[in-house]
Amino acid sequence: MESIIKQSYGFTENIQILLVNDGSTDKSGNIADALVRKHPKNIYQIHIKNGGPARARNIGLMHVRNDIDFVGFLDADDVYSLHMIREMAHFAETHPQVNMMVPPFYYLDDWGTRKKIGAHKLNTRFEQGSRVVNILEDYKAIHFYIGGTFLRFDRLKQLAFDESLHFGEDQLLITKLLLDDEAYGVVANVGYFYYRDMKEKGSLVNKSWQDKSRYQPFLEAVYQTYLRDSKAKFGAVIPYVQYLISYHAKLYFYKEHVYFREVLTDEEQTAFVTVFQRIFSEIEERYVWELDTAQPVKEMMLSLRKNGWPVRFETAPLVDIPAVTLHKKWRPNGHAELFSDIEESRVTLPEKSFFAAKTLFSTKKAVVVKRSEDQLIWDVVVRPAGTIRTAKIRLRPWELRGKWFYQNENRKVELEHFRLTAELRQRVKRRLKLKRALNQ
């Protein structure tokens, strides 16, 4: 709450805060009472019985003053950057046709002894600066979460959060609005910091993915609604919706969400995969392949799309140049490591093939590292032990600039120019900038 009170836009003159207390058992109720006493003209608290986030938001919206232009949503521990509301107000004034605005989203992970800030993958939307996104033209600029989102109140009055849903009520409302409006604003020079207590993360994730309503009921209530609404307006499932469903559905196959077999009965597993297959029959394969996620996840999604239940996992055919994900690690002693994570299911590289780094001083071949155990999705082996996990190159402090490449018998393919000292300097600058924005 302090980050709202300290906003540069003028808290007393321009901002109303509604605190919805839906039976909280921690100290947040006492904190809210103190804030109401301190700012009685700007902060109001509503007490309701716990009925889920959708009901809490709907009741909160009933108490918004009619002279309010935009409504933003903020969880208790989350933080706005100092100029968030000022920049949102400016964008709204200069783009009166826009009914929804969103800022860059950052994870604020609290490990107890330290806090770490990480950018959401969808922050690539902001690389072109503040602008209006047309979802028919830029289908990868998806948006589905309520944290940090600002919605025009007059438009929001026409909608409501679905109180029958325990998950996804926010994305259902947002997607309905976007399919109607076809556009929204991205405001680049601010930040929304989403607090996560990493000491408690495990138990929270477990609880979330152990709820049966997260599976078949969610697919039918949310994804199926997207398909229906898109076809009703456009006569087809538009690329935006196809990519949105693909992007969100990948969560079912992440290693931390391993409760599919434990939570669902055999009949419920069959029903989930049957509905999943039906939904993805309306989604082209290319939207799954375009996801920025591990290839085994994509292969699992497409295997279910093709084969249904029971799971018959199929790997993609091997290609001439191995599919890789590139990443780097900096070491405290000035050394660095380059990694080419092999996305495909390969036991060996082709004969006379290798990854290497060429610097001013030498050319170094990468060391191939194989899996010591099976990689699983649910209980399905997607990469057996003995397949290649990564190709790793260790660089000394004077070797941090050069070219990273793959070479086989026929050709040499450059993967990236690297300047690791400069990259590290830029990374440190970005982190310091985010910390300053958080602590203002």
Predicted regions and their residues:
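Conserved donor NDP-sugar-binding/catalytic core segment of glycosyltransferases
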Residues: V79, H83-A119
